Amino acid sequence: MSEHVKTELVDGVLVLTLQRPDKKNALTGAMYDALSDGLERAEADGTIKVVLFQGDGDSFTAGNDLADFAAQAKSNSDKESPAFRFIQNLGKATKPLIAAVQGNAVGVGTTMLLHCDLVFLAETARLMTPFVNLALVPEAASSWLLPARIGHVRAYQMFALGEPIDATTALASGLANAVVPATELRQKAMAAAVTLTKRPAGALSATKKLMRDFERIAARIVDESELFKERLRTPEAREAFAAFAERRQPDFTKPSS
């Protein structure tokens, strides 16, 4: 388990808390593995009825820790990445997933919400999917799930322009159940989670199975992953990551490949 992910079982709710607030809860490979361990534990343990994701500090998560991500991409090019393992576990989760989101939810911090059955946002929440900014493509089946949820043009705006949307807009777009004051966020999410623990677990899983096309989600996750890995090897991606490391704006004016 990662020191930056706290795992706690409370009244049938497995609470997974991101605890790297000094880095805006940016996700490392170890953190992804810890989250996957939690999801796999939930699937195998009948006493766990619901999984709740939350983050310490003023951000839910800044997405990938890019330095860690780049290092892993070089060293594990032929292996299943921790991020991919987590995304696969999200896609096949049969138990209710709930998210409590405050501040920034960047990249996977937003796409993972598409796999959550209930999403509660603090008034400070901002959702952002800046994959194209890094010369990459969407992941977590979001290239299918997001347009299906909010429509093509709004999804394309989020992907291609990479601009954040605020909590009110996210709620109106169907990406969340409620917007609440930050001080009430965790209480609201936990109350919903506890309510679900009292519902018949079999009926909840059967309902989720009817609502989600698990096979299509799994296939899209693989398709995105293959294209994602291809994009990582392009000059555009190398320029994007170099610009990030050098704290400058990337220059994509050269011919791409």
Predicted segments — roles?
Residues 86-93, 100, 106-160, 173, ...:
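CoA-thioester-processing core
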Residues 162-169:
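Acidic, divalent-metal-coordinating active-site segment for phosphoryl/phosphodiester hydrolysis
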